[in-house]
UniProtKB/Swiss-Prot annotation:
GO terms for biological process: regulation of DNA-templated transcription. Residues 127-225 bind DNA. It comes from Mycolicibacterium paratuberculosis (strain ATCC BAA-968 / K-10). This is Response regulator MprA. It is found in: Cytoplasm. CDD domains: REC_OmpR_PrrA-like, trans_reg_C. Residues 2-116 form the Response regulatory domain. Member of the two-component regulatory system MprB/MprA which contributes to maintaining a balance among several systems involved in stress resistance and is required for establishment and maintenance of persistent infection in the host. Functions as a transcriptional regulator that recognizes a 19-bp nucleotide motif comprizing two loosely conserved 8-bp direct DNA-binding motif repeats separated by a 3-bp spacer region. One of its GO terms (molecular function) is transcription cis-regulatory region binding. The modification 4-aspartylphosphate is found at D46.
Length: 228
């Protein structure tokens, strides 16, 4: 697997190169968004680790340009500001996952493994749509609709919704969701799951549709027509 690491901080680039290489990845480095896009165009990697704040062309614009051309390259965004608006901006731009700085290398590696696992194609799989209320998800074509409205989701959002729609009206614990969607458990202080649930709600309720994804306080989440 070839990973392109893009960060204007040389120390960060080298640290990630060493860690990813040690864990069996082939790693290439770029110092800003312009160089990254040139490298992707000439020899597309399997995944992208992308800093947000960079000179010339920032990470969010790199995401937007790739997604605007239909490129679904897996993207893990690194952000120095762990605010909701910053994370939403990354997801809006098309990132599949985000990781706030400073981060543990073990967590970055775990997220990368989970992201690459979600990108593996299902050979010879039949397209069987999953439906709950007026929400439909096709796990093979990756199409999602609410009524007649198409919904565009990142890989992480899709995996989260797929788990919920596969377990209708069943309360799913936070730890189970983290394990199944991300492949590992976040630190208990992390609120990544809450951010993704919130963003998924925004997309599935964009036209004022009734809420289907509900919080079960102290436990997790459930997909149902009415609040628990």
């Amino acid at each position: 697997m070839r990973i392109l690491v893009v960060d204007d901080d040389r120390a960060v680039r080298e640290s990630l190169r060493r860690s990813l290489s040690f864990n069996g990845y082939s790693v290439e480095l770029a110092h800003d968004g312009v160089e990254a896009l040139d490298m992707i165009a000439s020899d597309r990697p399997d995944a992208l680790v992308l800093d947000v704040m960079m000179p010339r062309l920032d990470g969010l614009e790199v995401c937007r340009q790739l997604r605007s051309t239909g490129d679904d390259l897996p993207i893990l965004v690194l952000t120095a500001r762990d605010s909701v608006s910053e994370r939403v901006a990354g997801l809006d731009a098309g990132a599949d996952d985000y990781l706030p700085k400073p981060f543990a290398l073990e967590e970055l590696l775990a997220r990368m493994r989970a992201l690459l696992r979600r990108t593996k194609p299902e050979d010879d799989a039949e397209s069987v749509a999953m439906t709950f209320s007026d929400l439909t998800l096709d796990p093979v074509t990756r199409e999602v609709t609410r009524g007649q409205r198409r919904i565009s989701l990142t890989r992480t959002e899709f995996a989260l919704l797929e788990m919920l729609i596969a377990n209708p009206r069943r309360v799913l614990t936070r730890s189970r969701i983290l394990e199944e969607v991300w492949g590992f458990d976040f630190p208990t202080s992390g609120n990544a799951l809450e951010v993704y649930v919130g963003y998924l709600r925004r997309k599935t309720e964009a036209d004022g549709e009734p809420r289907l994804i509900h919080t079960v306080r102290g436990v997790g989440y459930v997909l149902r027509e009415t609040p628990p």
